Every structure is written in structure tokens, then in C-alpha cells.
Amino acid sequence: MIVRNLTEARDSNRRIVSPDGNWESTRMLLKDDKMGFSFHITTIYKGADFRMHYQNHLESVYCVRGRGEVETLADGKKYPIEPGTLYILDKHDEHMLRAFEEMEMACVFNPPLNGTEVHNAEGAYELNAEAL
């Protein structure tokens, strides 16, 4: 059994802050845990407006707190995000994420992240990032 505490994880190297200042993510479960997926609690800062395109991963995102929107770039559709909303990037969807308020999100990635990933120039995470 694995048991971790979010407050303790935030005070460790499991807390990753994006270089562009849009988000921070506490990586609670990672590839080395051998569960087949990773689980993160991610804070998207108010005013963040950025493009992502996870070419190497599938992701599901559940909004715990805050409000914003996600836009699929293929068709320009915008979907409101509020507490209780789940969006699923099941087709490696290129998208924009906008935070009208600070948002706290619970994120699941498959394949699992190693831990140190930040978005590359295409808005994706690399598969060969350093493990925590």
C-alpha cells in the first residue's frame, strides 16, 4: 500500500512549478510507483491562458475548485470548467486552458509521468523526463 499526504508532498520535490508561471503540480503518484498511471493535484493560477497538446499522454482532469474554460483547438468549442467538471483528453486533443479564478484540478495521466515534466514548445510532456 502507498499512502501520501498532499501537504507533505507540496513541501517536497513532488511540487513542480511551471517555468511560465501558469501552474504548479504536486505529483502524488508517478511511474516509479508502478500503477500504470500518474495522479497529480494541479493549481492553475488565475489569469492563466495557455496551449497544451499532450501528444505522448492521455489525461483526465477533474475540477475541485475554481472556474475557467477549456477550448478544443480543432473545432474552437469552449467548455466551462467549474467544481465537479471532468474533461477527458482522449484523442491527444490540442487545447487552450483558461483560468478565470485560481483552479485546483485532480489530473490522471496515462502513461504515467516520471515526475519532473514541464510542457515543451508544443505544449506536451516528454516521455523521458527525469524521475523524482
Curated annotation (Swiss-Prot):
<dbReference type="InterPro" id="IPR011051">
    <property type="entry name" value="RmlC_Cupin_sf"/>
</dbReference>
<dbReference type="GO" id="GO:0019491">
    <property type="term" value="P:ectoine biosynthetic process"/>
</dbReference>
<comment type="similarity">
    <text>Belongs to the ectoine synthase family.</text>
</comment>
<comment type="pathway">
    <text>Amine and polyamine biosynthesis; ectoine biosynthesis; L-ectoine from L-aspartate 4-semialdehyde: step 3/3.</text>
</comment>
<comment type="function">
    <text>Catalyzes the circularization of gamma-N-acetyl-alpha,gamma-diaminobutyric acid (ADABA) to ectoine (1,4,5,6-tetrahydro-2-methyl-4-pyrimidine carboxylic acid), which is an excellent osmoprotectant.</text>
</comment>
<dbReference type="Pfam" id="PF06339">
    <property type="entry name" value="Ectoine_synth"/>
</dbReference>
<keyword id="KW-0456">Lyase</keyword>
<dbReference type="GO" id="GO:0033990">
    <property type="term" value="F:ectoine synthase activity"/>
</dbReference>
<protein>
    <recommendedName>
        <fullName>L-ectoine synthase</fullName>
        <ecNumber>4.2.1.108</ecNumber>
    </recommendedName>
</protein>
<dbReference type="InterPro" id="IPR014710">
    <property type="entry name" value="RmlC-like_jellyroll"/>
</dbReference>
<dbReference type="InterPro" id="IPR010462">
    <property type="entry name" value="Ectoine_synth"/>
</dbReference>
